[in-house]
């Protein structure tokens, strides 16, 4: 898995980075076909991902890298995938691709951390001792619902997070509509949050881009006060919505949620 062709960013280049409404990259057929087929066929069962929790309609269940590494029920291809994408080698891929964007959005970050992005020490989230950046990879299982369901509306992720990577693994027999990733921007040049939280009322923002929930599609973007996103309403389905979530985060926020000019 150290081969970059097995990385979700293996096909990425600087020329593929879109700037609006905030910097991001979309890669379709992100993984080699043979690897994707194996990963799709061995995605963990809901029983593994539930971890004994009751299954709720349209509920979200995540299973992180620290647990995957110890779980022999997980296929070796997945454990290798998780190990690489929670490694310093992958973090350096991200910095090589998005370093300039991260520095532009967070001009004082390296000064605060006391190191260049390329020099940051990483480890897997929840492991101790904690390093500069904690990395994680998660299986994410949004359970099926017999009613239309929206997973989450316009919001920003936690301000300690550096980036988000979403690799979609849509079930071949999933004929539902929706469940797509949406990019939004604030209206009227001002950031407005609900009660100081990360969520935003629809009337205070507008949807500007929709990225379809499609198999073997990667969406990757650095976090900032502008990275407003949502998931569209999904039609009833007997199939879960499946993806892998890629995360890096710091102990302290790298931006703030105060209202003001967008």
Segments predicted by a language model, with ranges:
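N-terminal regions that are enriched for targeting/export leaders
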Residues: 2-7, 119
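PAPS-dependent sulfotransferase catalytic domain
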Residues: 6-12, 145-148
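Short, Φ-rich (hydrophobic/aromatic) sequence segments
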Residues: 1, 78-85, 164-169, 247
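Short hydrophobic "helix-edge" motifs at membrane interfaces and signal-peptide entry regions
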Residues: 11-14, 216
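Catalytic core of non-heme Fe(II) oxygenases with the double-stranded beta-helix
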Residues: 91-260
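Non-catalytic N-terminal targeting/anchoring module and adjacent flexible stem/linker
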Residues: 1-2, 259-262
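N-proximal short alpha-helices
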Residues: 8-12, 63, 67, 138, ...
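Non-heme Fe(II)/2-oxoglutarate
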Residues: 4, 14-112, 116
